[in-house]
């Protein structure tokens, strides 16, 4: 059952990348990213309002717990990490072929595995090590094929941006574990819906500020 869910998730992520690429063609990155965060926040806004003003979501999966500054400071940091990853990722996707972006983005789980070893002291099994080796091999082969298309991994700034996005995405995954783990296990113990809902809201606010300061004043130049 979980394997089927993983394949469905991978399929939707594939469509997501294709639609992102199409949206970025002949469009500026910042307004597209703002609209992405805006519509994402609209999805979770009703859950926040219903949870705080009614009892209809009490004891349900969609209930958003009330949080103070202690909880929200961690969520704000998560929004900064994720949004930074998205900005670098969107910029690189606009300038690179999707056949190059997809495989490099697929190395993020490998980065998370390595990060889990370094940060949380976890151990990889044989199959996970095989996955790490295959991911590194695929990057090497991508660098070779990229040269044939005129894309040099060591001299292309868009590739550099893409790797920054992947690293920040992996950091976000490791940070999620810290946020969700109970205090007894060294984490913060935040509610999943609290994090998911409010981090989308904060992302939208950050992007609104970035759009107003960086894009709107120069959009006609």
Predicted regions and their residues:
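Membrane-interface interhelical linkers
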Residues: 1-20, 25-30, 34-96, 144-163, ...
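Juxtamembrane helix-loop boundary signature in multi-pass membrane transporters
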Residues: 1-11, 110-173, 177, 181
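Specific alpha-helical transmembrane segments that line the substrate/conduction pathway
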Residues: 78-82, 90-142, 194-197, 201, ...
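A short glycine-/small-residue-rich loop at the edge of a beta-strand within enzyme catalytic domains
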Residues: 166, 170, 186-192, 196
